[in-house]
Swiss-Prot record:
Residues 1-49 form a transit peptide. One of its GO terms (biological process) is photosynthesis. The keyword Plastid applies. It is found in: Plastid, Chloroplast thylakoid membrane. This is Photosystem I reaction center subunit IV A, chloroplastic. The keyword Magnesium does not apply. It comes from Nicotiana sylvestris. The gene is PSAEA. Residues 57-73 have a biased composition (Low complexity).
Length: 141
């Protein structure tokens, strides 16, 4: 019965990798070559080619430091402040027309329900907090 050696099945192996992350105009290629052929009495050879990269220009070190940019004014806070008493206007809510206190308010304008409200009374699932949209609550004076 004939047998096959995996080393003889893959007689040559070549890898060529271009330097993609280079920010210079020169390109660099690294090549690896493995051969299972025996050339006379020498063992198989490994060939590696590599090019040295040029040193980055030192222009950034000699440039004068730029002035700090003027900070833009903070946008006004979204929603009620923490601890504010609010009335719930969402009709399908367990706490509809009830009052609770604001625990947190997400400042991201893309958040659908940014206001977290905590209540003294728990609902049927034994939960005492819920998230609401800005138009589903009103502040109680």
């Amino acid at each position: 019965m004939a047998s096959c050696n995996m080393a003889s099945a893959a007689s040559n192996f070549l890898v060529a990798t271009p330097n993609v992350a280079s920010n210079t105009n020169t390109s660099r290629t690294t090549m690896l070559f493995f051969s299972s052929k025996n050339y006379g009495s020498t063992a198989p050879r490994l060939v590696v080619r590599a090019a040295e990269e040029a040193a980055p220009p030192a222009a950034a070190a000699t440039a004068e430091p730029a002035e700090a940019p003027v900070k833009a004014a903070k946008p006004p806070p979204i929603g009620p402040k923490r601890g504010t008493k609010v009335r719930i206007l969402r009709k399908e809510s367990y706490w509809y027309k009830g009052t609770g206190s604001v625990v947190a308010c997400d400042q991201d304008p893309n958040t659908r329900y940014p206001v977290v409200v905590r209540f003294n009374k728990v609902n049927y699932a034994n939960v005492s907090t819920n998230n609401y949209a800005l138009d589903e609550i009103e502040e109680v004076k």
